[in-house]
Amino acid sequence: GRGSNMRSLVEHQLPVRAVVSNRAEAAGLAFARDRGIPALALDHRAYSSRESFDQALTELIDRYHPEAVILAGFMRILSVGFVRHYEGRLINIHPSLLPAFAGLDTHARALKAGVKVHGATVHFVTPDLDAGPIIVQAAVPVRPDDSEATLAARVLAQEHRIFPLAVQWLLGGQLRIDKGVVHVAGNPPQWMFNAS
């Protein structure tokens, strides 16, 4: 992606040990390098299978001994082996109120469906696409005059609010999953609504 969610994590002073992308031209890599954060590209096209790429990706990530692996604009479906390796430490941000509009083109699909509320979700990653336990969500109204671009901009602003929060909870050991439901120590709100 554009790297804006990763930038949001850095700007919230969360510890980022490395930034990895499968695209050498990813904007987030340059941002990380400019701040002295190791920034690495691993081209998935150099590998014969998803599993072989994910194995190389795992080996690269593990060199940094991460407490968590945070997916921000990483647009590849990960293998079961990769997901299991980081189970409970692997989270993603998705531009919809899951379980609605999993996958791609969320804003266009939301507008076409005529939903009145749209938003973003931070969730644990499981082998099933965009189906992991939900950590936090933020909602925005869908306006009658919204385009994909205007809706996406409002959702992205909410992503920048909830993603650092979820990462902070994860790194602080505040998250617990019970029967597929995420609980946060201290019971802070796990949702936000911005009426504007």
Question: What positions do the PLM features span?
Answer:
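N-terminal Rossmann-like dinucleotide-binding module
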Residues: 2-31
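Short, basic/aromatic-enriched C-terminal tail that caps enzymatic domains
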Residues: 7, 179-196
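Donor/substrate-binding cores of folate-linked one-carbon enzymes
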Residues: 12, 22, 68, 72-185
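Conserved beta-strand segments of alpha/beta enzyme cores
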Residues: 15-18, 38-40, 89
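Short, structured coil segments at secondary-structure junctions
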Residues: 35-36, 86
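Short beta->alpha connector loops at strand-helix junctions that form conserved
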Residues: 40-45, 93
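Glycine-rich, highly charged phosphate/nucleotide-binding loops
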Residues: 45-59
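Glycine-rich phosphate-binding loop signature in dinucleotide/nucleotide-binding domains
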Residues: 60-66
